[in-house]
Amino acid sequence: NDLKVAEKVRGSSGIGLQRYVLAILFNQVIGEANRMLAKVHEGRYHLFRSDDKGKGNKRGLELKVHDNRCPEAQGRSVSMLSGGEKFLVSLALSIGLSTVAQRGGVQIEALFIDEGFGTLDDSSIHDAMDVLESVRRSSGMIGIISHVQLLESNIPTHLEVIKSGEGSRIRLA
């Protein structure tokens, strides 16, 4: 009897219930990430799940990016992105995951981003900060850990860690 239920759940696609549910949630995360990516680099990038028949656990969960500057291209693996592009895609996916989780009832009061901004040019930093500000207004606190000076002028309240011979101290700026 349990075997028949398992076969029904597995279905004709053979992907299994868990992977099926993951794919639905992943599509939602990708959708939210694409909403953010539409606001940076003039909407140049668009994420999508690959239809490639992957190996083992990755099957159906492989992520690719379409570059609108190359409309004839089929999309490329996110592993082929530059450092700055990877940071923006990672940021978009983090925000997308946070949004989907909150929609499901999980309360996320803070989002912390550790570095990554150093890989971006000034225009991309401004784009990312605009997106983060809109997220902050709707979702709560965002903490950014960075050495990029340009961020200091874009963040109204920040903590500065000052190193000295006796140790480090924190200054609210």
What kind of feature is each model-predicted range?
Residues N1-A173:
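Terminal ABC-like ATPase head and other globular end-domains that cap long coiled-coil arms
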